[in-house]
Structure formats: C-alpha cells, structure tokens
Amino acid sequence: MTNIRKTHPLVKIINNTFIDLPTPSNISSWWNFGSLLGLCLIMQILTGLFLAMHYTPDTTTAFSSVTHICRDVNYGWLIRYLHANGASMFFICLYAHVGRALYYGSYTFQETWNIGILLLFTLMATAFVGYVLPWGQMSFWGATVITNLLSAIPYIGSTLVEWIWGGFSVDKATLTRFFAFHFILPFIILTLAIIHLLFLHETGSNNPTGIPSDTDKIPFHPYYTIKDTLGALILILTSLTLTLFTPDLLGDPDNYTPANPLNTPAHIKPEWYFLFAYAILRSIPNKLGGVLALLLSILVLAFIPMLHTSKQRSMMFRPFSQLLFWMLVADFLTLTWIGGQPVEHPYMLLGQLASILYFLLILVLMPTASLIENKLLKW
C-alpha cells in the first residue's frame, strides 16, 4: 500500500513542501531565515488575534485599552510585548533573508524575487499601520507625517491624503481604518508567502556556490527540519529574552504619552526598522524628491536582476563584489543610525552621503565590479 502522505490530496502538498522536498545538500544557515519568517508570521498572527480581542480602535479609548491589556488581562503584558518585539524580530529576519538573496544571487529566480518585493512592501505597510494603533504621541505624529507625504503627489495629493485620513486630520476614522488594515494585511502576507514558496519550488533552492545542484539533492526532512528547528529555538530564545528583560529597548518613550494633536514631539521618527528609508527621505530637501527616493530605496531591489552583469551567480568566488556587498551592509546600518538622529549638522551631510552611496553601490558600483571580475577571469 502506498504511503498516505504521498497519495492524500492535502497531505501530498505538505509532503512535497516540507518532507520529501529535494534540497541542495550544501545550503548554509543563511537559508534558515525563510522558515523563521514563517514562524514570525504565525507568532504575530496569534499574538495579534489575542490583542484584537481586548483592543478598541477608538481615539478616546485606544491608549487606555492597551494599558488595560498590560495591567488587567492575564499575561496581556507578555502578549503585547511579544507582538511589539515580534515585529522587530520579523524585520531582522527579513533583512537577513534579503541580504542572503543579494549575496548568493537568489534574485535570478525572477518570480520568487518579485513576489518577495511585494511581500516586503505589504509587511512595511502592516508594521506602519500597526504602530499607529496604541495611539501614543509617536503613533499619532508618525501617522500624520508619513500619510502627509502623499500630498507631494501632483494634482491628486491633497485629495488622496484626506481620503486616507477620512477627514481633515488624523482622527477616529483614520484609527478605525488602520485597525481594519492591520487585521487584514497579515492574511494577505500569508497568501503571498504561499505563492512565494510555490514559485520557489518550481525552480528549487539556490545554494552558496550558485551552481545548479540537481545532481546532489537530499530530502528536506530530517536534514533541514532539524536545522530549521535549531534556528527556530534561537529565534524564540532571542524574542523571549528581549520581551522579558528589555521589552522597551526598541520602542520609543514618546509612545507612552497619549496622542496630543496640540503638542509635537521634539524628534518624530518611525520604528528602527524603517530608519534607513526615513534617513533617505530626509536627505533630499524637496518633498516630492524625498518621497520618490523613499519609494526607490525599496523598489531598487526590482532592478537588481537586470543589473546582474557577472557570469557567476553567487558572490562566493567574487572578492570585489563581496567588498561592495559589505559596504552596502555598513551603509544600511549607517542610514539606520542617522535616521534616528536629529536633523542637524553633521547628521544631515552624513545622511546625504550615505543615501548617495546606497544607490551608487546598487545601481553602478556592483554591476561595474562584476564586469571587472569577468574581465579578470577572461570571460
């Protein structure tokens, strides 16, 4: 009798995805982040569901309801901080996942890569609307500043902003719709993640060498299930350590002050995972230019497959490209740091230089280095 996992219509899908999936034998721990992102998503949906049971999306009670969750709900404080810090873990895994794809040339899987970019945008939208929900000072002013950027769009800008606000300022209507968006978007992310996986399994995984590994595949289970379990345990341990010892480490103290439209915080800044894009936005003294640069800071990923000039797929054997890649990582971290600093000298100048370098590395220097490497190898 044939094994049920290979014949049953539903179990067969799970089998072909997580059990009998042929996987390259040499993929490193950098390939763990895909499954970790899946784990983060499940954790966020579950903690979010329990938070939604006690949260009220109304300007008069939103802040109080979050306080109520922390003080009066059984383990409410734990659920709330797991959810808040879970977002940070999500983005850490996400940036590592994208970084790995850039380093090893996984972006040549065109469909998988494009769905990934769509996932990144959806995730950023989810995190942004979620940050507005506690209705603290930074929630309110963050929502005001970021939604206001749309007014830079010629002709329809102002109408668009008022349409998103549901009035003439960020108010009750805005909070209610942001809660609705924050509830629905994770399920859209889940759907996109399944499509992402579907496209990946059409081609099979890449590996550190970038060379096709059809001749050397091993089953996903038990080899990579055990490897992913280790990654998952490290993620859970890190998440719990952060939540139980320093729950407010990555948050903003201003968000413990209820939203007040009459009092602007000294430094309006988003959560740490958006600071790099925020630094790029602030580097350009023109509103529309800043918005376009902000959009392009993520959208530039879509051009990377077209800018792949190397004859090799991975950066494993390309020292010049490796050097530029780590420069990009350092630049990303510099932008993140500058995004959290006040708009004054020397941060403004540093931010502008780091922003120019960011686009220069991706669009010019890396493709040029690849061509030089080809030349040196007489290819």
From Swiss-Prot:
What protein family is recorded? Belongs to the cytochrome b family.
Query: Which named protein is this?
Result: Cytochrome b
One Pfam family it belongs to? Cytochrom_B_C
How is the cofactor bound, in the record's words? Binds 2 heme b groups non-covalently.
User: Where does this polypeptide localize?
Assistant: Mitochondrion inner membrane
Q: Give the required cofactors.
A: heme b
Segments spanning the bilayer are 33-53, 77-98, 113-133, 178-198, 226-246, 288-308, 320-340, 347-367
Q: Which organism is it from?
A: Platanista gangetica (Ganges river dolphin)
GO MF term (any one): ubiquinol-cytochrome-c reductase activity
Q: What does this protein do?
A: Component of the ubiquinol-cytochrome c reductase complex (complex III or cytochrome b-c1 complex) that is part of the mitochondrial respiratory chain. The b-c1 complex mediates electron transfer from ubiquinol to cytochrome c. Contributes to the generation of a proton gradient across the mitochondrial membrane that is then used for ATP synthesis.
Keywords of the record, alphabetical order, are: Electron transport, Heme, Iron, Membrane, Metal-binding, Mitochondrion, Mitochondrion inner membrane, Respiratory chain, Transmembrane, Transmembrane helix, Transport, Ubiquinone
Please give the CDD domains that the UniProt record associates with this protein: cytochrome_b_C (cd00290), Cytochrome_b_N (cd00284)
- Specify the domain of life of the species encoding this protein: Eukaryota
Per the record, membrane topology reads: Multi-pass membrane protein
The record ties this protein, via InterPro entries, to: Cyt_b/b6_C (IPR005798), Cyt_b/b6_C_sf (IPR036150), Cyt_b/b6_N (IPR005797), Cytb/b6-like_sf (IPR027387), Cytochrome_b (IPR030689), Cytochrome_b_C_euk/bac (IPR048260), Cytochrome_b_N_euk/bac (IPR048259), Di-haem_cyt_TM (IPR016174)
List ligand-binding residues for heme b b566: H97, H196
Q: Which residues bind a ubiquinone?
A: H201
Claim: Electron transport is one of the keywords in the record: yes
Return one Gene Ontology term, BP aspect. mitochondrial electron transport, ubiquinol to cytochrome c
| Entry GO terms, CC | mitochondrial inner membrane; respiratory chain complex III
Q: Which parts of the sequence bind heme b b562? A: H83, H182
Disulfide bond annotation, renumbered to this chain: none
User: Subunit details for this protein?
Assistant: The cytochrome bc1 complex contains 11 subunits: 3 respiratory subunits (MT-CYB, CYC1 and UQCRFS1), 2 core proteins (UQCRC1 and UQCRC2) and 6 low-molecular weight proteins (UQCRH/QCR6, UQCRB/QCR7, UQCRQ/QCR8, UQCR10/QCR9, UQCR11/QCR10 and a cleavage product of UQCRFS1). This cytochrome bc1 complex then forms a dimer.
What's the further remark here? Heme 1 (or BL or b562) is low-potential and absorbs at about 562 nm, and heme 2 (or BH or b566) is high-potential and absorbs at about 566 nm.
